[in-house]
């Protein structure tokens, strides 16, 4: 079986700031846009998280939770420099590196001869090198498949690692909450719970045909992940073509005001994701998706190089008026298409 490592830096942007200014180390700190400009939080250190401050949160809300919060606008050049150094450390062990953003990546070390071929020791060495060379901490997950490696990297945060061996996959999955599977949000989790499905072990006993009936193509993903199946390869030349967020509603909505409020909420999350994945390059298009109660959907796009909430609201309002035809809306999504494949390739090759 393969040996996959998922490395995730610990509160990366904030950690770089605390490293460069030790006075920030023990106080609540966040990186993000100002509350006066209706900004959002990109990341927060652990003292701030104890107050409930988290990424994608409106900055104004963060200050309500933690009035003494120190807010910095961020220094993307410093974060990119650190990311490049981290990427160089990864490359000492394998060429099979799939960056997900500035602060996390998958590594396939199946054929690496380092550390006697032990993925556990390789992950430990990588984390030690990051600590000694950059004075930053990273967490890691080690597993034979990608999604379990990612889940494992969260289990001993911060500054730890967790291993799932091939023999441990089935015992681990038995009690694993379905909410841990990427793509299972709050609404999907509630729908699963209504069917009596809370853990991967329960999915293993559930007919695939029923999952397909209730969840469409995603039903197969649920079934495969719950059985420990994830055949996705590590993609060193992975090109991210778009960034998007969407929400399936527990109940259909019929009034524009509800849709507008949801778009306001989704916009904050989209802005945060885009900043993390693509901090300084322009976008090509931005758009809105509405899915109706009959499962038909419409997607409207607008060519514009900068993410703009007013434009997205205008696009959505036009789609609402022109395409809805009195139908209830069950899903709302926002997305941006990234500028150019060559620029995107350079972004990933340069690790930011």
Curated annotation (Swiss-Prot):
Gene Ontology terms, MF aspect: damaged DNA binding; DNA-directed DNA polymerase activity; magnesium ion binding
Protein EC: 2.7.7.7
Domain UmuC: 4-185
Catalytic-site annotation from UniProt: 104
ATP-binding in keyword set: no
Binding site for Mg(2+): 8, 103
Catalytic activity reported: DNA(n) + a 2'-deoxyribonucleoside 5'-triphosphate = DNA(n+1) + diphosphate
Compartments where found: Cytoplasm
Protein family according to the UniProt entry: Belongs to the DNA polymerase type-Y family.
Alphabetical list of HAMAP family matching this protein: DNApol_IV
Function: Poorly processive, error-prone DNA polymerase involved in untargeted mutagenesis. Copies undamaged DNA at stalled replication forks, which arise in vivo from mismatched or misaligned primer ends. These misaligned primers can be extended by PolIV. Exhibits no 3'-5' exonuclease (proofreading) activity. May be involved in translesional synthesis, in conjunction with the beta clamp from PolIII.
UniProt protein name: DNA polymerase IV
Taxonomic source organism: Yersinia pseudotuberculosis serotype O:1b (strain IP 31758)
Gene: dinB
